[in-house]
Regions:
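Patatin-like phospholipase
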Residues: 1-37, 45-198
């Protein structure tokens, strides 16, 4: 049997996911594979690197910093969200265990939306030369962030095409035990947009 954990996105609601993953790490619970969409991709970084508390510390210490989301991010990175700040600069303050993260025993994928097809795609850490850019693509919300170019294709937030990344299961039937971490209740259904938003 192979185990998989799917991590839903949800922006700041992802703090719930980071708490659940911290408890998993405290109890040495690690699956064969992790797949994260949007904020779930960010949470997956700390989980796969086996760094309890790191994702929580990033959000609680820097989540309101204008370099994280806001005017400084917009000026410096031309994005409302400062992915370079979150994924690269913060490593100097909150060290990231890259050696543990890149351990081939742990599989990690992020869900993205292909801007040409509008379909979800799943990028493997093991087959991507710039995986942190793939994580940024997974979190790049339409209209708020620029499209991210990776391997000649443009991508945006994985949640735009697949909130949970369930299509991953069709592409990877080898995972027969699946845990899905949600940031909303199972009964949640998104309301139809009104007026001009349709």
């Amino acid at each position: 049997m192979k185990n998989l954990i799917l991590l839903e996105g949800g922006s700041y609601r992802g703090i719930y996911t980071s708490g659940v993953l911290d408890v998993f790490m405290e109890h040495d619970i690690y699956p064969d594979c992790v797949m994260g969409v949007s904020a779930g991709a960010l949470n997956g970084l700390g989980y796969v690197a086996q760094q309890p508390g790191r994702c929580r510390d990033v959000v609680l210490s820097y989540g309101m910093d204008p370099r994280y989301v806001g005017t400084k991010a917009l000026r410096k990175e031309h994005n409302l969200v400062g992915f370079d700040f979150i994924l690269r600069e913060l490593q100097h303050v909150l060290p990231f265990d890259a050696e543990s993260f890149y351990d081939p025993a742990r599989k990690f994928y992020v869900g993205v939306t292909n801007c040409t097809t509008g379909e979800p795609e799943f990028i493997s850490r093991d087959h991507c030369s710039d995986f942190l850019t793939a994580v940024a693509a997974s979190c790049s919300m339409p209209y708020l962030c620029r499209k991210v170019k990776l391997n000649g294709e443009y991508y945006l937030d994985g949640g735009a095409s697949s909130r949970l990344g369930l299509e991953f299961l069709d592409q990877h039937p080898e995972y027969d035990r699946v845990v899905v971490l949600l940031t909303r209740r199972m009964s949640y259904r998104k309301k139809k947009p009104s007026g001009l938003m349709r």
